[in-house]
């Protein structure tokens, strides 16, 4: 593990930072002479003129630390020597005292050069909003829930995140797509018609009468008891138990009277899905409700729906139609456990009209029918008794903003909008530029609403909106790279909300208050507690723990027949809620490695073999030791994203643990080394294959680190189930643990356990967790680095290591609390400087 900075190193850093340019050059020359002597005696046989292992030649490596590429080579040398990996153990090494003196000198040189670059160039280059940030910024700025992310090109990833400036390039495709996205979002702000009150209640019987295909269900997986519909299976997707589809987009109130039957006193898990595809998309699950036995219960909620969408109800713990009637089963009515639906009701839209977005863009400008707006713009009088409008009339005469003073209104609205969009005060000359765009459009007889949307669109596609600009605070002369208050507000907002600063942040920025530690801490707390704070958990944890990849693989149904959509939905929720709880309660970050609790529902608990968890709703559960669970490593979502749909790989999982949990990513494999393909015949075990692989010198040095955590996790299959043996494709079937009645083919025994690079043996994942927990500082170091990368949009640089070690020390003092670490990151030099 990476060693902490010693006092001698810190002292050297201070002294080296004070050295002037010419003196620094002399020190570099002195270091180069010192290093050359060591290199000739101990390094050039592998890294010299005749042989350059890892592409590194040390006898000619200049001490030009100001050059980024050269400095990067020196950092590799420093890290390998510091870890004791070089020179190799079977080679003669220089005296320890000589090595340490050299390392102290090298660290100081690298730190000084890196810090100098940061103080002159800044550590974060200009970065654009990624597509998630662009969408959330539009939503918050315009007050709309429009989905524009899908219109934008995928973002590249660097250092584990998609908001790192170095990877966020800009192409012509981006510029075109940003225009499309801005246009789509802006168009949703202007309603084409006033809302039409809509309310419809359907009894269970009426649900079946609305679609003739229900006749196929009745008498099989469903039946009627008077007006009540009893569902004993989950219907096919084209036979929904659903509300009426809504006529227009908006927020709707949904209610239903339901109860469970035949459940032996236990609740039945019911899901509500928003969809126009009849509930097939688990990503759009609105809620899970536990429905009690026999007692009619009113379930209600308020949900945003698009036109023609409806809300589908289904008993999620009921069998599917295929499970009930497929595979040669008799096609007869089934009874027993079921969901009784007395009625469903939908009402809305219940939003405030016009929506907040319209008020933000057109405050004080009334909405009128297009014909009336044209008359107002032309100065013609309106008819004294206009005909009463019907909903259909707005199809050919939609509502538009109608201004009697378009030039004055355009200037007023734009000058108010631009500082919000650009996240800081806007120079008058720049404001005039956007005002002129709209005035020119008005002069060309463009309707007022269209002219304003043109001005807004140009602003939302401008560099001032697309890029996060971070000017320094000119008033703080003692710190040439200190961010100004508006830059701090923006950095904090995109860190915690993935979006633009709100009014409170901008007001504090205007007063210069955000440079005060107590104010910054209070704002961090406020933002984490805000509903928008969920975006930090979703976007940071989604990338750190690879939850975004949960859909990347589909378990083979012939091998993992127990995998279903209920389990799939529950997997990432466990990890997301687990992350949220550690952050909310400032729990120690060691809980990410091991905990005696997690968030489960009945489906996930059954999968884990944990008893006494009833119902579909997720809740905090005490874990049993026998379950071998606790922390993120043993959660089904993580075990799924680190495997393919058929088999596991100790290499993939081991690499994941090194990168994500330990923060010690292995070097990429040599280009001429083939990947290991598991022997699907079962003749050769994965350990035997890896042992052979490790006989290659180029592979052994990395695999001694990769393989131990990988084999520690081999007792978990591709969907996170515990296993003592691999599944085969033939042979004698045995019953699958935790799934009574389900059979699988038994293969070879699972190979688990191993030995750490330091020679410490471990039996299984429970043992290996203790290996990780023995170095809490490294766990803190890893998370500190990842938070710094994500919060600033730049990878860790050498000068940042000093700050990272300061964060680790503070974390140790605060018992490794995760929320405390996040606060310290926000207060750090790296976060508050360009």
What do these predicted ranges mean?
Residues 1-7:
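N-terminal secretory signal peptides that target proteins for export/translocation
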Residues 60:
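Active-site donor-binding loop signature of nucleotide-sugar glycosyltransferases
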Residues 26-56, 69-76, 80-85, 89-834:
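Low-complexity, glycine/serine/threonine/alanine-rich intrinsically disordered linker
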Residues 9-21:
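Bacterial N-terminal signal peptides
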């Amino acid at each position: 593990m990476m060693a902490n900075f010693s006092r001698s190193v810190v002292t050297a850093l201070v002294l080296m930072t004070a050295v002037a340019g010419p003196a620094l050059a002399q020190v570099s020359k002195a270091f180069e002479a010192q290093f050359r002597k060591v290199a000739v005696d101990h390094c050039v046989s592998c890294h010299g003129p005749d042989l350059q292992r890892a592409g590194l030649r040390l006898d000619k490596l200049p001490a030009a630390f100001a050059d980024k590429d050269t400095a990067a080579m020196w950092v590799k040398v420093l890290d390998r020597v510091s870890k004791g990996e070089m020179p190799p153990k079977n080679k003669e090494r220089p005296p320890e005292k000589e090595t340490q003196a050299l390392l102290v000198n090298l660290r100081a040189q690298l730190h000084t050069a890196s810090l100098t670059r940061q103080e002159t160039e800044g550590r974060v280059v200009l970065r654009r909003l990624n597509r998630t940030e662009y969408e959330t910024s539009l939503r918050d700025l315009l007050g709309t829930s429009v989905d524009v992310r899908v219109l934008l090109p995928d973002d590249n990833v660097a250092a584990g995140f998609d908001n790192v400036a170095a990877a966020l390039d800009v192409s012509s495709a981006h510029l075109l797509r940003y225009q499309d996205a801005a246009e789509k979002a802006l168009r949703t702000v202007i309603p084409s018609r006033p809302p039409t009150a809509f309310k419809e209640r359907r009894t269970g019987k009426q649900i079946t009468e609305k679609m003739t295909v229900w006749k196929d269900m009745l008498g099989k997986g469903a039946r009627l008891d008077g007006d009540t519909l009893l569902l004993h299976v989950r219907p096919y997707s084209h036979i929904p138990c659903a509300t009426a589809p809504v006529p227009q987009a908006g927020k709707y109130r949904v209610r239903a009277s339901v109860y469970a039957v035949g459940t032996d006193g236990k609740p039945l898990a019911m899901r509500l899905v928003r969809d126009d595809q009849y509930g097939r998309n688990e990503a759009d699950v609105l809620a899970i409700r536990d429905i009690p036995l026999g007692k009619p219960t009113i379930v209600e909620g308020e949900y945003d729906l698009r036109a023609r969408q409806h809300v589908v109800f289904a008993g999620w713990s009921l069998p599917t139609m295929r499970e009930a009637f497929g595979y040669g089963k008799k096609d007869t009515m089934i009874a027993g456990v079921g969901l009784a639906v007395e009625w469903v009701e939908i009402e809305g839209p219940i939003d405030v009209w016009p929506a907040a977005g319209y008020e933000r863009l057109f405050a004080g400008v009334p909405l009128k029918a297009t014909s009336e707006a044209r008359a107002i713009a032309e100065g013609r009088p309106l008819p004294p008794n206009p005909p009463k409008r019907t909903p259909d009339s707005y199809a050919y005469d939609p509502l538009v903003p109608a201004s009697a003073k378009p030039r004055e209104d355009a200037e007023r609205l734009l000058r108010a909008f631009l500082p919000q969009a650009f996240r800081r005060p806007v120079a008058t000359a720049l404001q005039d530029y956007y005002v002129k765009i709209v005035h020119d459009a008005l002069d060309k007889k463009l309707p007022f609403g269209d002219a304003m949307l043109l001005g807004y669109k140009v602003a939302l596609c401008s560099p001032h909106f697309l890029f996060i600009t971070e000017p320094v605070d000119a008033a703080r002369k003692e710190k040439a790279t200190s961010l100004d208050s508006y830059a701090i507000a923006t950095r904090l907002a995109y860190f915690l909300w993935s979006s633009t600063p709100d009014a409170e942040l901008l007001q504090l920025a205007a007063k210069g208050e955000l440079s005060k530690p107590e104010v910054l801490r209070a704002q961090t707390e406020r933002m984490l507690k805000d509903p928008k704070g969920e975006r930090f958990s979703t976007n940071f944890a989604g990338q750190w723990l690879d939850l975004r990849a949960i859909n990347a693989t589909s378990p083979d149904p012939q091998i993992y027949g127990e995998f279903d959509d209920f389990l799939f939905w529950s997997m990432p929720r466990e990890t997301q809620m687990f992350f949220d709880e550690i952050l909310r309660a400032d729990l120690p970050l060691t809980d990410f490695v091991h905990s005696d609790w997690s968030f489960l529902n009945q489906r996930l608990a059954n999968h884990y073999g944990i008893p006494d968890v009833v119902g579909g709703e997720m809740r905090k559960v005490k874990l049993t030791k026998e379950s071998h669970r606790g922390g993120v490593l043993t959660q089904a979502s993580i075990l799924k994203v680190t495997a393919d749909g058929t088999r596991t790989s100790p290499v993939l999982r081991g690499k994941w643990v090194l990168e994500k949990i330990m923060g010690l990513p292995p070097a990429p494999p040599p280009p001429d080394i083939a990947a290991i393909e598991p022997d699907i015949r079962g003749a050769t075990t994965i350990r035997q294959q890896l042992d052979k692989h490790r006989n290659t010198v180029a592979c052994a040095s990395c695999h001694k680190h990769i393989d131990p955590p990988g084999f520690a996790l081999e007792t978990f299959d591709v969907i996170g189930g515990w296993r003592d043996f691999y599944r085969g494709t033939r042979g004698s079937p045995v019953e699958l643990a935790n799934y009574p009645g389900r059979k699988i083919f038994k293969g070879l025994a699972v190979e688990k356990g191993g030995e750490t690079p330091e020679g410490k043996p471990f039996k299984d994942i429970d043992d290996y967790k203790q290996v990780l927990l023995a170095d809490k500082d490294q766990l803190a170091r890893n998370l500190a680095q990842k938070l710094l990368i994500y919060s600033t949009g730049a990878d860790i640089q050498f000068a940042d290591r000093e700050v990272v070690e300061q964060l680790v020390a503070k974390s140790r003092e605060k018992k490794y609390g995760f929320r405390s670490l996040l606060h310290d990151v926000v207060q750090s030099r790296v976060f508050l400087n360009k």
